[in-house]
C-alpha cells in the first residue's frame, strides 16, 4: 500500500484557546503520522519567524495546508507575516525560486458568517472564491497546485455533531489528500 504524502499543516489562530471549531478539526488530525501540525502562534508569539526552519519544513512536505480563521477578508497577522517572509523570492518564486514547484496548497478556513453572506449582493458583497483569490494567486506564484479550500461557515455556531462531521471529512481527506478534493 502506498504511503500518503507528507502533509504540513500550518495552523494560525491568535485565540486558539477560544476556537471550538478549530480544536475539533485539529484533535483527530494530530493522530495522523504523515501530518506535521505546526502552530505558528505557539512557535512565534513574538512574530520573529525562523525563515530557514520554515523553508526546510516546506521542502520536507508535499502538501501544505493553511488552517486559519478568516480575519478581515484575509488571514491572521502572523500568517500574513509568514507568507511575506517565508515565501521569499529566490526560494518560492522569482529567479531560482522553485522550491515549492509541484507541491499542493489547500486552505482550511473557519468563518464567523453564514455561507449566504458571501455572495454578490450579500453582507460580504463577494463570493468566497473572490475573497480567497490572493491565496490562490500566491500558490500560483509559488508554482504550487491549488486544491479547492475547505470552508467551515458560521463556525462558532455549528452544532457539535456538524463540527464532528467536518472533522471526519477533514481526516478522510488528509489520509489521501492527492486523490480526494483536487
UniProtKB/Swiss-Prot annotation:
Pfam families: Flavodoxin_2. It catalyses: a quinone + NADH + H(+) = a quinol + NAD(+); a quinone + NADPH + H(+) = a quinol + NADP(+). GO terms for molecular function: electron transfer activity; FMN binding; NADH:ubiquinone reductase (non-electrogenic) activity; NADPH dehydrogenase (quinone) activity. Keywords: Cell inner membrane, Cell membrane, Membrane, NAD, Oxidoreductase. Its EC number is 1.6.5.2. GO terms for biological process: positive regulation of potassium ion transmembrane transport; potassium ion transport. Regulatory subunit of a potassium efflux system that confers protection against electrophiles. Required for full activity of KefB. Interacts with KefB. NCBIfam families: PRK04930.1. This is Glutathione-regulated potassium-efflux system ancillary protein KefG. The gene is kefG.
